Design a protein with these regions (language model features):
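Ordered hydrophobic segments in well-structured contexts
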Residues: 15-19, 61-65, 102
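Terminal interaction module
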Residues: 92, 96-161
């Protein structure tokens, strides 16, 4: 079976993190995970099953991970993005918006701003989520959550100064 529990993947495993806005409630979370599981169970590249896993963090971040021994292809990645477009439509959420910045608000909840809003209102001490992280080990070590000043997000704020 190509889909495994994400905890079984090594830290070097390739990941894609997709921010979801608004955050999913329990029924939508379950629906999303069901559709993603079905996709991952059949995901392949050049006829070879892709050993993969998924997780949903904070109800706002879909993580898709691939074992480093599996090879993806342009077509297999395109199919993954097709799934994401389907999820957006079916669940009434935004997943593929590159202009969304995800951060932790004052109460510790995940919130979003557009990139222009972040340039205007972001602060260097805001905890942001780096959805560009490429290895699962970065999530496990908490390196994808950090103050904006320690991330590429800080440069957006500096540009506005």
């Amino acid at each position: 079976m190509p889909r495994i529990d994400i905890s079984r993947l090594p830290d070097e495993s390739r990941i894609w993190i997709f921010g979801i806005s608004p955050a999913l409630d329990k029924p939508k979370s379950l629906r999303l995970l069901s559709l993603v599981d079905r996709f991952l169970d059949d995901w392949s590249a050049h006829g070879q099953a892709i050993v993969s896993a998924r997780d949903l963090l904070h109800g706002s971040f879909l993580v898709i991970a691939v074992d480093q021994q599996s090879e993806t292809s342009g077509c297999s990645i395109d199919r993954m993005f097709g799934l994401l477009r389907q999820l957006e439509s079916e669940l009434g959420v935004v997943i593929l918006d590159p202009n969304r910045i995800f951060y932790q608000d004052g109460s510790g909840k995940v919130a979003t701003m557009t990139r222009p809003e972040f340039v205007e209102n972001g602060r260097q001490d805001m905890v942001v989520f780096d959805i560009l992280a490429e290895r699962i080990g970065r999530i496990r070590r908490g390196l994808w959550q950090k103050p904006a000043r320690d991330s590429w997000h800080g440069a957006l704020i500096r540009q506005a100064s």
